[in-house]
């Protein structure tokens, strides 16, 4: 069995934090994140890079910032246009010398065109070049002109990122970049490049380092996370995703493992079997299906049928009967008929999804689907979306109500968003639970505790701590 080298993790983390990190410069960075959890991870890394290189500290107020970064998403046109709207709102801050940068997938897709549209932007960088941000800003100062770097140096950025700084008991770990599926509607392969997996030992070292700092839950990230194929040490051996999960499962201190986003075509028998052997693997899965019609799935170039998707779910439920399932849907793909939509609604009834991210089809420039003839009115698409979302909401309500009276294991994350005097945490099945932590509330943050569910709301639960003997 392969034995990864993990012993250097505590020393490395300590030396960076205690010895080499620059003193706070007084400068502040504001980062606005759009889109997926991969972007959230990248935003954290931007903050880490600027803290390590220049001593920047984060701020939630752009008016107080010396550097403003927009980490963008190009999956839908609305998200892309919002970036330029937000850029316009901070333009006035240039008068006092604030630096502005645009990163992420819009940056990768548009490149120098962003400077043409918003000439007050100082740097434009892609998902694979965020580690070069300090150098780009320095070059901007030396040359007196905006800098653009949207190249794809594969996985180079991970070799130049400082060790992760922990904020809470849960953390993201990116295990791969890019996508090689080339679905007809999707820009990700063009903005993040082809699939490239981080080395196996490197991922395990990062997770072990997080565990040493008190992290109890890790979410493994990738555009197609279950397509992971990482090189094992100095050998020619390759670890698949199921193997990686096994090794992460054995890291002391890690109590929960999540991952996103997975692809149905990469749901191997070994991955399904992992749900029987790995209790730390949470009882929740996000598995995008996108549509319930085989004809539309073919047009999307998803590579599977509805029956194949349902077969995967059936095998999973044979192992974990109460597994919580969420998914993605695209409504109004070119050529979608009433019958196609009805098939999607039937799939929702058949599976019983806990939640979904659903949107009207947004043609993205440069993708094959953008050239398809689309004769369905926006009003029809909107009505279909509303029907789909209402059905999912009914499912969510019923499933939440069934949890009333049960005891759920909850990782306490911090103050409740509903009431800062209370606490909130997350169940294995990814439900938020709000509760009164009592006089010892501060000591509960970061801990796993049992909560008896007393009330069900549309998108959260309420409960009370259960005292153990």
Curated annotation (Swiss-Prot):
Kindly list the cofactors needed. Answer: [4Fe-4S] cluster
> Where found, per UniProt?
Cytoplasm
Keywords of the record = 4Fe-4S, Cytoplasm, Iron, Iron-sulfur, Metal-binding, S-adenosyl-L-methionine, Transferase, tRNA processing
InterPro entries with a match to the protein in the record? Elp3/MiaA/NifB-like_rSAM, Methylthiotransferase, Methylthiotransferase_CS, Methylthiotransferase_N, Methylthiotransferase_N_sf, MiaB_methiolase, rSAM, rSAM_horseshoe
Q: Per its UniProt record, what SMART domains does this chain match?
A: Elp3
Which residues are listed for [4Fe-4S] cluster 1 binding in this entry?
Answer: 36, 73, 105
Cofactor: bound how, per the entry note? Binds 2 [4Fe-4S] clusters. One cluster is coordinated with 3 cysteines and an exchangeable S-adenosyl-L-methionine.
For molecular function, the Gene Ontology terms on record are: 4 iron, 4 sulfur cluster binding; metal ion binding; N6-isopentenyladenosine methylthiotransferase activity
Keyword rRNA-binding appears in the UniProt entry = no
Q: What is its EC number?
A: 2.8.4.3
Q: What class of enzyme is it?
A: transferase
Read off the Gene3D superfamilies from this record.
Answer: Methylthiotransferase, N-terminal domain, tm_1862 like domain
SUPFAM superfamilies to which the protein is assigned, alphabetical: Radical SAM enzymes
Q: Which residues form the Radical SAM core domain?
A: 165-398
User: TRAM domain: from which residue to which, for each copy?
Assistant: 401-467
Catalysis performed (reactions): N(6)-dimethylallyladenosine(37) in tRNA + (sulfur carrier)-SH + AH2 + 2 S-adenosyl-L-methionine = 2-methylsulfanyl-N(6)-dimethylallyladenosine(37) in tRNA + (sulfur carrier)-H + 5'-deoxyadenosine + L-methionine + A + S-adenosyl-L-homocysteine + 2 H(+)
Determine the domain of life of the protein's source.
Bacteria
Q: Which residues bind [4Fe-4S] cluster 2?
A: 179, 183, 186
Q: Per the database record, which ranges form the MTTase N-terminal domain?
A: 27-142
Complex formation: Monomer.
Function noted in UniProt: Catalyzes the methylthiolation of N6-(dimethylallyl)adenosine (i(6)A), leading to the formation of 2-methylthio-N6-(dimethylallyl)adenosine (ms(2)i(6)A) at position 37 in tRNAs that read codons beginning with uridine.
Query: So what family is this one in?
Result: Belongs to the methylthiotransferase family. MiaB subfamily.
Protein name listed in UniProt: tRNA-2-methylthio-N(6)-dimethylallyladenosine synthase
């Amino acid at each position: 069995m392969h034995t990864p080298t993990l012993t250097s993790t505590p020393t490395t983390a300590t030396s960076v934090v205690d010895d080499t990190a620059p003193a706070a410069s007084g400068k502040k960075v504001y980062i606005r994140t759009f889109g997926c959890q991969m972007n959230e991870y990248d935003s954290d890394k931007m903050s880490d890079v600027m803290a390590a290189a220049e001593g920047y500290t984060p701020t939630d107020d752009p008016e107080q910032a010396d550097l403003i970064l927009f980490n963008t998403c190009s999956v839908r046109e609305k998200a892309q246009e919002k970036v330029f709207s937000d850029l316009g709102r901070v333009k006035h801050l240039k008068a006092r010398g604030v630096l502005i940068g645009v990163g992420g997938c819009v940056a990768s897709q548009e490149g120098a065109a962003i400077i043409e549209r918003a000439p007050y932007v100082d740097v434009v960088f892609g998902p694979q070049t965020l580690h070069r941000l300090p150098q780009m800003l320095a070059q901007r100062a030396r040359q007196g002109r905006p800098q653009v770097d949207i190249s794809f140096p594969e996985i180079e950025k991970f070799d130049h990122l400082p060790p992760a700084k922990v904020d809470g008991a849960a953390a993201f770990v990116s295990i791969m970049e890019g996508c090689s599926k080339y679905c007809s509607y999707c820009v990700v392969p063009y903005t993040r490049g082809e699939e490239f997996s981080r080395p196996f030992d490197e991922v395990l070292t990062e997770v072990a380092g997080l565990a040493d700092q008190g992290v109890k839950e890790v979410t493994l990230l990738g555009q197609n996370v279950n397509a992971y194929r990482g090189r094992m040490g100095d050998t020619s051996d390759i670890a698949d995703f199921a193997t990686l999960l096994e090794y992460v499962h054995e890291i002391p201190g890690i109590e929960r493992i999540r991952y996103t986003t997975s692809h149905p075509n990469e749901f191997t028998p070994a991955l399904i079997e992992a749900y029987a052997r790995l209790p730390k693997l949470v009882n929740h899965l996000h598995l995008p299906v996108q549509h319930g019609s085989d004809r539309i799935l073919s047009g999307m170039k998803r590579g599977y049928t509805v029956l194949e998707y349902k077969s995967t779910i059936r095998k999973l439920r044979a192992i974990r009967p109460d597994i919580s399932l969420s998914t993605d849907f695209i409504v109004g793909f070119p050529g979608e008929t009433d019958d196609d939509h009805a098939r999607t609604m039937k799939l929702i009834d058949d599976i019983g999804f806990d939640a979904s991210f659903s949107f009207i089809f947004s043609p993205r420039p440069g993708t094959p689907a953008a050239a398809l003839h689309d004769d369905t009115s926006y009003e029809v698409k909107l009505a279909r979306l509303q029907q789909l979302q209402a059905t999912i909401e009914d499912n969510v309500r019923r499933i939440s109500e069934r949890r009333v009276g049960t005891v759920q294991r909850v990782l306490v994350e911090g103050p409740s968003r509903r009431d800062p005097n209370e606490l909130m945490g997350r169940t294995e099945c990814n439900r938020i639970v709000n509760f009164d932590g009592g006089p010892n509330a501060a000591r509960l943050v970061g801990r796993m505790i049992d909560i008896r569910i007393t009330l069900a709301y549309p998108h959260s639960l309420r409960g009370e701590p259960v005292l153990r003997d």
